[in-house]
A protein has these predicted regions:
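Acidic, metal/ion-coordinating pockets
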Residues: 1-219
Length: 219
């Protein structure tokens, strides 16, 4: 894809004339080199060299050019290093700024191979790192206190009018022999403690939701 195509959203119909616009960018700290960036008519991916105000305006212009009234906008960001358990301050500033400018209804982050904490800012969910659901890392083993065999599905319920978050359910899975299944009780408890600890630092927390995982609580 050339630069225009790389920055263009995927458009999915939601019914009733509404659409979901999915925009995607990556950053060099995720391991994507700047040489892969689409430029002019040269193929590549959409890269934000830095998470600064200029990058914010780049995203804002692309969203504003494509968005129609009623559209739901997801900004998907492949950012940050692997095997990290803290959300970098520049990611928090950038994601919050996208919400404050009315650019993103959902910020969907990914790169680290394990789930990272979730924040709700201005009524909008910021998933800093969704981890891996299916990967080919089975057998590599844990990195420190982190592990890649545990992943999550995230189910978001948003208000139809203003797209504010109403509910966020999280269902954990464990990868065994390249198949997804229910995690062991010990693995599920470990993941719950890890996620809840990080979420509480961002003003959110996890609450058990029957046998199928957790739901997010926020102030």
């Amino acid at each position: 894809a050339d630069e225009a195509a790389a920055c263009a959203p995927a458009v999915l119909p939601l019914g009733g004339g509404q659409r979901l616009l999915l925009f995607a960018w990556t950053t060099p700290d995720s391991g994507v080199p700047l040489a892969w960036a689409a430029e002019g008519h040269a193929g590549g991916v959409a890269v934000l060299p830095r998470l600064d105000e200029r990058a914010t305006q780049v995203v804002a212009r692309q969203v504003q050019a494509a968005r129609r009234p009623g559209d739901l906008v997801v900004v998907s960001l492949h950012w940050g290093g692997n095997w990290v358990d803290l959300v970098p301050s520049e990611q928090r500033r950038f994601a919050r700024r996208l919400v404050e400018l009315g650019v993103a209804d959902v910020v969907h982050g990914h790169s680290a191979h394990h789930p990272l904490p979730i924040e709700v800012h201005g009524g909008r969910p910021i998933l800093y790192g969704c981890g891996d659901l299916i990967n080919d890392y089975e057998g590599i083993g844990p990195r420190g206190r982190l592990r890649s065999d545990l992943g999550c599905l995230y189910a978001l319920t948003l208000a139809r009018g203003d797209h504010r978050l109403q509910r966020l359910a999280i269902v954990p899975f464990q990868l065994r022999r390249f198949r997804l299944g229910h995690p062991s009780p010990a693995a599920e408890q470990w993941l719950e403690r890890l996620l809840d600890e990080g979420c509480r630092s961002l003003g959110t927390s996890l609450e058990r939701a029957g046998l199928d995982g957790w739901q997010l609580r926020w102030r």
